[in-house]
Amino acid sequence: MSRFVAENPGPGGDLDTFITASPLEYDTDLPSTNILGTVISVGQTARWEEATAALNADPDRRYFMYNGRRPASGTFATDDDGVALRELPWGQFKTGISRWYYWNSNYWNNFLGGPAVRDLTQVDPQGASYRLGTHTNVFKSAHTFGSHDFFDPIIGETGVFNYSNGDGVLMYPGTDRVFPAESRGIDGPIASLRMKHWRRGIQDVKYIELAMQVNAAATQAIINSMVPKAMWEIGVADENDPTFVHEPPSWSTDPDDWEAARAQLINIILGSNAVAF
């Protein structure tokens, strides 16, 4: 695709091309794609810092992150901590990621789940109302993405392909014609709390940008205290097998801590006009 764009003699030659892949193999495997998006859970710190710095320094390329995985960042899962998406923009700012791409927002039809989407009556006698074919009743079913194969005696309901709760769903149908019993009769979507938490984190970053203009050192100290390690800063347990780390996320899960950090940023911005919160 990148080659076709590059060879286009008309306006199409100016199109951007985007792919989700690791920055570590970018130069060799994807030399012509100009936007790269990556999912990360852990990463070798030095290698990732070098690779992302090279991408950010290239005027013809841009580097994004997408979705989210612990412990590198907060996630979009409904069973993550409430502050997860508030943390995400802080980690994004700290590590210099220009944009965060999220897939999807209204994935109410689990067409990627494959044939292994069970009839939930095997788990719950009332489960027939949880889905209709691949359509998910998002007001009844926590599971929204991936296969839905079996019930594990230890971890419970799960699947072999990317079983997840809330993934792909940031908003809910105000009017539901597939499951009319769940319809709220609202002309438009219903925002999730996760979307609101994400918005709050984005607002925090705007305060960070303003505070940086007043006192960069104090502002950076707040960032470091709230997100000691983000993205590839988390490192790996074994450099010979850089796929895991025995370490929880570094940030506080107490929402009061995040409100206090915002108050500190505001007082940096206000300077002599600082107020007590």
Q: What function would you assign to each model-found segment?
A:
Residues 1-25, 114-277:
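Catalytic domains of carbohydrate-active enzymes that cleave complex glycans
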Residues 1-114:
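Catalytic-core regions of glycoside hydrolase
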